[in-house]
A protein has these predicted regions:
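Alpha/beta-hydrolase active-site loop
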Residues: 160-182
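N-terminal export and membrane-targeting signals
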Residues: 1-13
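A fold-wide structural signal in alpha/beta-hydrolase
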Residues: 105, 138-148
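Glycine-rich "HGGG/HGxG" loop immediately N-terminal to the catalytic nucleophile
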Residues: 151-159
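Short, surface-exposed "cap/lid" segments of acyl-processing enzymes
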Residues: 80-86, 92-137
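Gly/Ser-rich "nucleophile elbow"/oxyanion-hole loop immediately N-terminal to the catalytic nucleophile
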Residues: 93-102, 175-185
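Catalytic-loop region of hydrolases
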Residues: 8-9, 17-98
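Sec/Tat-exported extracytoplasmic proteins
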Residues: 79, 110-113, 174-181
Length: 185
């Protein structure tokens, strides 16, 4: 009976440790998202800005790609009804000198893992960690731009999977590159 009790106690301790670890990870993830909320807050002057205008830009420290600088952007885009919106994006810019004709751009309309604020690629702790071709694109001189899509990680409804909305977000993300150092196409 003593061995059975010891095993049950041990199983209880292991279950409690797993539960605490899971809760701790969840709390840390929520805190990370809370810390990013100010960056993704919709500026008051969105409607007056041109499509592609960049409201905020900051380095992405957890996205390290050899030969590149990485940025998180908040830029102006449009919803399918023509109203102004904001979207986040990831911009990856080669550090090598730009060719005289400008840099080629690879605009990536990626999939997503959900519709929560933390599912937006530019809000993830380790964005694009399983996308090996990005390093090859950078090595070949491409600027890579990957929009989150309006409403995914930003305020307002998500129009994810609506072709026109994604086209607007992708086109305006490319326009936003005009406001990123050394990235203009």
């Amino acid at each position: 009976v003593t061995a059975k009790k010891a095993i049950l106690v041990l199983l209880g301790v292991v279950a409690a440790a797993i539960l605490l670890s899971t809760l701790s990870h969840r709390v840390a993830a929520e805190r990370q998202q809370d810390a990013l909320d100010a960056f993704y807050a919709t500026p008051p002057d969105v409607a007056a800005a041109a499509p592609g205008a960049v409201f905020r830009r900051e380095p992405l420290p957890n996205l390290q790609i050899a030969g590149a600088r990485t940025y998180r952007l908040l830029y102006r885009t449009e919803r399918t009804d023509g109203s102004a919106a904001v979207s986040g994006a990831i911009a990856i810019v080669p550090t090598a000198a730009a060719p005289a004709a400008g840099r080629p751009v690879l605009a990536w309309a990626h999939g997503t893992v959900g519709l929560g604020r933390g599912c937006a690629p530019s809000r993830r702790e380790h964005p694009l960690q399983s996308v090996p071709w990005i390093a090859d694109a950078v090595a070949n001189g491409f600027v890579v731009i990957a929009p989150d899509y309006a409403g995914l990680g930003t305020a307002g409804p998500s129009e994810y999977l609506i072709g026109r909305a994604e086209a607007n977000d992708l086109t305006n993300a490319v326009r936003a590159l005009d406001n990123v150092p050394d990235a203009a196409p």
